[in-house]
UniProtKB/Swiss-Prot annotation:
Further comment found in the protein's record: There are two active sites within the E1 molecule, allowing it to accommodate two ubiquitin moieties at a time, with a new ubiquitin forming an adenylate intermediate as the previous one is transferred to the thiol site.
Protein name: Ubiquitin-like modifier-activating enzyme 1
Subcellular location: Cytoplasm; Mitochondrion; Nucleus
Annotated gene: UBA1
Residue positions, PTM N6-acetyllysine: K671, K980
Enzymatic reactions: ATP + ubiquitin + [E1 ubiquitin-activating enzyme]-L-cysteine = AMP + diphosphate + S-ubiquitinyl-[E1 ubiquitin-activating enzyme]-L-cysteine
Sequence positions bearing Phosphothreonine: T800
Annotated organism of origin: Bos taurus
Spans annotated as 2 approximate repeats: 63-611
């Protein structure tokens, strides 16, 4: 997904402000953050029993409290075919207390279609016993055991959650009744070919602590009326985002102090900036200020038992285009259970006799259903299709339903997120051939091989086609691992002339293990692509997978060249950034290859399918850009912890990376100063002053010098600069209109006084001094006592605020000031910088920020720097966990969402491989497992454009053969003439990449020179780059006029040169 972590700030009540101003008392609110010494630093650790290194990304989805509840829950998973193993995998990765695997059956050939922890040599062995050691490897914190006896009541009593998969209805009803009456939460999951079913019963009194998982919202108050009800108006900088029925609390309100610290109150939204609260008519008059924060109030929800809900079901929709289908499938699945009980088997694949019988049974089930459930008209065609595919077992369907079911288990354990209430049905009938006559019973008969479960649905022809596919998988992270697993199960690229190429340049880290399930602890530091490829070969030894370690981009186009792409059947993205996604999208459009795109963000996920000449591309629509924080807010007027964390990240770069890089360039590049002077605004001054500081004014010789520097810098940032700001804008300052300057989003700061006994102050000095020492190659220290002793001898110069110092209140002011340059100061700097010749062999060591290493002082510095600044402005601080999320721009992630999303991707893959050509056969998908919400839509058709009577889309282009029959290349003049005669288009501008090759306003002399030059020669000269031997064609962009002189939009040109 293209979005970044949703990290809206929640405010908590702070100290009452002084009457008549927005200034808060000069004391700290940091006592709310626990400090636990670890690794020599005071770190905020929420719970020592949670391995934050392993569960890092999942903790940002669930939170510590939900995670703790998860760790006290034992879960039974009954049925270890493809669906059961998917659910077990996800909840083991999630970190429940213990998992017991139950199955009394033995592995059959058809199980290998989706059960990725069964091998061919396991045929005939108990599924639970074979799977147990392989599942146990996923998470050393979760004991996994196997049980092969009957599901008796004494055994069931040991579990908090019971999951039944692929079980008879008789067993479901018996177990369901027992679980409901004994407070055991129940999940029933079933998949039949292209159909899936899910049922949840979490008891009559489940406490839901958080229904959506979103960070609580907060907003700044600008007005509260004395009324019944009182109306709250928020600052118009941003919409408040609340909904009617939300509960809120208030803090920092001046005047109407009765609101501060009051019990959470329910609101009614009146508009994007207003809402009503309780009766405020007897409260004090509102003066100014205040923060309103959403409060998540626990609520009780009640479930019916399985027998009761079977008779009177409630449905969660998965596809609003199939509105009546859940009720029809509710009848169909009951009929299927009756059929299986009568015959001891599922209906035979695509057998008309069994399909007719299932329709008859379904009619009988419908007839005896309660009136509210009874279907006036049974969809017999749907029931027949259920019969046709019910014997099938598809890995993608299991991945989707298994991801959902595992998330429901986590909801049952933790009380976090809204459960499915209570039935969910899903189908993917669009995956069947568009030619309804293509499948016959003969084609779907079992072959006694690992793909029998899939052949039962799609026949043997598609299986052969899947094996011959050549696919490029870009990324081997969480989505990449799940894709490879599904590819292995469905047989993609498993025939002699098939292949999957997977590329990923990353190595495995501990935090990956929680959701990138192909990796194990002993794989940490190994290459992802190699390890993932080896792991899926264990799942299906026939898969032909080649691993690369290349980043996709212009620099690897000699590897992923024309030959490479032309041999592909399609591309699947498993990327984590928008730039790489857009690059691969452009390559797929150029080479006209299908692209399967997906992404996740916590419990949210999306799938997009891109089909040549049919759909729009990934880049056709984009998310709006993220709202950036104004520079002046960061520098002088922060009001949220996000502001102080971004400021701390900027500090890190400006202290420990950029100066060192600039010094090294100054010492090695003779043109560095000349190049720096050409930078815009005040940048030349800032860069050269930083170089002078690093080489002359602040260059340390010893560790003690680094401690002194850190102490001085502490005073500059948290005392001196704040005192200067308050000198310029005193607490009682008024604006030109007479309003208090320190009001609204401007929080009045106060300076801090350094105290070596304050853990946070010492944290800052130790982290800053160690990082500063690293940039000079000096050895640091973690000895807190020794550093405290050194600090006692540091002399801090007395600071007196200066008059005439300009502090900019807005970014517009700042930009105006940056336009003027102090040339005399620049000349002085150039003269005083030491000559590189005088510093032979000297170099500095820039530090790249790395958030996941708790021993490198990076996050120690960020947390201390941010929370000290937050203390300056009386902003509630953030613990290390939250700080890492925001400063590290971490994308929350959980295995359940990934599994479900990839299941949907591979359903689209079935359609792509079959060559579906109807737009309504494909489905773009969006889901949010927390709500739960599912939305599917047809992909948008590629937008159509026109010049003259010629229609075109992004998939069309002009094909121009650069080499002429006589072996000579086309010149610019010939190129321009070709378009005039062949297409009646007059080219007004012509470019290749960022290079302008021709324009109507080009100087006559330059134009005359170029007209007779070959096109490739012009490209090389203008771009100052030689064309590589792998380049067979150039992409040229045109601006054109038609014969009437009107500007017309036209496709690009593919200009072939070899």
């Amino acid at each position: 997904m293209s979005s970044s972590p949703l990290s809206k700030k929640r405010r908590v009540s702070g100290p009452d402000p002084k009457p008549g101003s927005n200034c808060s008392p000069a004391h700290s609110v940091l006592s709310e953050v626990p400090s636990v010494p670890a690794n020599g630093m005071a770190k905020n650790v929420s719970d020592a029993d949670i391995d934050e290194g392993l569960y890092s990304r999942q903790l940002y989805v669930l939170g510590h409290e939900a995670m703790k509840r998860l760790q006290t829950s034992s879960v039974l998973v009954s049925g270890l075919r493809g669906l059961g193993v998917e659910i077990a995998k996800n909840i083991i990765l999630g970190g429940v207390k213990a998992v017991t695997l139950h199955d009394q059956g033995t592995a059959q050939w058809a199980d290998l279609s989706s059960q990725f922890y069964l091998r061919e040599e396991d045929i005939g062995k108990n599924r639970a016993e074979v799977s147990q050691p392989r599942l146990a490897e996923l998470n050393s914190y979760v004991p996994v055991s196997a049980y092969t006896g009957p599901l008796v009541e004494d055994f069931l009593s040991d579990f908090q959650v019971v999951v039944l998969t692929n079980s008879p209805l008789e067993d479901q009803l018996r177990v369901g009744e027992f679980c409901h009456s004994h407070g055991i939460k129940l999940v029933v999951a079933d998949t039949r070919g292209l159909f899936g079913q899910l049922f949840c019963d979490f008891g009559e009194e489940m406490i839901l602590t958080d229904s959506n998982g979103e960070q609580p919202l907060s907003a700044m108050v600008s007005m509260v009326t004395k009324d019944n009800p009182g109306v709250v108006t928020c600052l118009d900088e941003a919409r408040h985002g609340f909904e009617s029925g939300d509960f809120v609390s208030f803090s920092e309100v001046q005047g109407m102090i009765e609101l501060n610290g009051s019990q959470p109150m329910e609101i009614k939204v009146l508009g994007p900036y207003t809402f009503s609260i309780c009766d405020t008519s007897n409260f004090s008059d509102y003066i100014r200020g205040g923060i309103v924060s959403q409060v998540k109030v626990p609520k009780k929800i009640s479930f019916k038992s399985l027998p009761a809900s079977l008779a009177e079901p409630d449905f969660v929709m998965t596809d609003f285009a199939k509105y009546s289908r859940p009720a029809q499938l509710h009848i169909g699945f009951q009929a299927l259970h009756h059929f299986c009980a009568q015959h001891g088997r599922s209906p035979r694949p695509h057998n008309e006799e069994d399909a007719a019988e299932l329709v008859t049974i379904a009619q009988a089930v419908n007839a005896r259903s309660l009136p509210a459930v009874q279907q006036g008209s049974l969809d017999e065609d749907l029931i027949r299709k259920l019969a046709y595919v019910a014997a099938g077992d598809l890995a993608p369907i299991n991945a989707f339903i298994g991801g959902l079911a595992a998330q429901e288990v986590m909801k049952a354990c933790s009380g976090k997120f809204m459960p499915i209430m209570q039935w969910l049905y899903f189908d993917a009938l669009e995956c069947l051939p568009e030619d309804k006559e293509a499948l016959t019973e003969d084609k779907c008969l079992p072959r006694q091989n690992r793909y029998d479960g899939q052949v039962a649905v799609f026949g043997s022809d598609l299986q052969e086609r899947l094996g011959k596919q050549k696919y490029f998988l870009v990324g081997a992270g969480a989505i990449g691992c799940e894709l490879l697993k599904n590819f292995a199960m469905i047989g993609l690229g498993c025939a002699e002339d098939g292949e999957i190429v997977v590329t990923d340049m990353d190595t495995i880290e501990k935090s990956n293990l929680n959701r990138q399930f192909l990796f194990r602890p002993w794989d940490v530091t190994k290459l992802k692509s190699d390890t993932a490829a080896a792991a899926v070969r264990q799942m299906n030894p026939h898969i032909r997978v080649t691993s690369h370690q290349n980043r996709v981009g212009p620099d690897t186009e000699r590897i992923y060249d024309d030959d490479f792409f032309q041999n592909l059947d399609g591309v699947t993205n498993a990327l984590d950034n928008v730039d790489a996604r857009m690059y691969m999208d452009r390559r797929c459009v150029y080479y006209r290859k299908p692209l399967l795109e997906s992404g996740t963000l916590g419990t949210k996920g999306n799938v997009q399918v891109v089909i040549p000449f049919l759909t729009e591309s990934y880049s056709s629509s984009q998310d709006p850009p993220e709202k950036s924080i104004p520079i002046c807010t960061l520098k002088n007027f922060p009001n949220a912890i996000e502001h102080t964390l971004q400021w701390a990240r900027d500090e890190f770069e400006g202290l420990f990376k950029q100066p060192a890089e600039n010094v090294n360039q100054y010492l090695t590049d003779p043109k560095f100063v000349e190049r720096t002077l050409r930078l815009a605004g005040t940048q030349p001054l800032e860069v050269l002053e930083a170089v002078q500081r690093s080489l002359v004014l602040q260059r340390p010789q010893t560790w003690a010098d680094c401690v002194t520097w850190a102490c001085h810098h502490w005073h500059t940032q948290y005392s001196n600069n704040i005192r200067q700001l308050l000198h310029n804008f005193p607490p009682d300052q008024l604006t030109s209109s007479g309003a208090p300057f320190w009001s609204g989003p401007k929080r009045c700061p106060h300076p801090l006084t350094f105290d070596v006994s304050n853990p946070l102050h010492l944290d800052y000095v130790i982290a800053a001094a160690n990082l500063f020492a690293q940039t000079y190659g000096l050895t640091g220290s973690q000895d807190r006592a020794a550093v405290a002793t050194l600090l006692q001898s540091v002399q801090v110069p007395e600071f007196t605020p200066k008059s005439g110092v300009k502090i900019h209140v807005s970014d517009q002011e700042l930009q105006s000031a940056n336009a003027s340059v102090d040339d005399s100061r620049l000349e002085e700097l150039k003269a005083t910088l030491p000559s590189p010749e005088k510093l032979p062999g000297f170099k500095m060591y820039p530090i790249d920020f790395e958030k996941d290493d708790d021993t490198n002082f990076h996050m120690d510095f960020i947390v201390a720097a941010s929370n000290l600044r937050a203390e300056n402005y009386d902003i509630p601080p953030a613990d290390r966990h939250k700080s890492k999320l925001i400063a590290g721009k971490i994308i929350p992630a959980i295995a359940t969402t990934t599994a479900a999303v990839v299941g949907l991707v591979c359903l689209e893959l079935y359609k792509v491989v079959q060559g579906h050509r109807q737009l309504n056969s494909y489905k773009n998908g969006f889901l949010n497992l927390a709500l739960p919400f599912f939305g599917f839509s047809e992909p948008l058709a590629a937008p159509r454009h026109q010049y003259y009577n010629q229609e075109w889309t992004l998939w069309d282009r002009f094909e121009v053969q650069g080499l002429q029959p006589n072996g000579e290349e086309m010149t610019l003049k010939q190129f321009l003439d070709y378009f005039k005669t062949e297409h009646k288009l007059e080219i007004t501008m012509l470019s290749q990449g960022v290079s302008m090759l021709y324009s109507f306003f080009m100087p006559a002399a330059k134009l005359k020179e170029r007209l007779d030059q070959p096109m490739t020669e012009i490209v090389s000269r203008v771009s100052k780059r030689k064309l590589g031997r792998h380049v067979r064609a150039l992409v040229l962009e045109l601006c054109c006029n038609d014969e009437s002189g009107e500007d017309v939009e036209v496709p690009y040109v593919r200009y072939t040169i070899r």
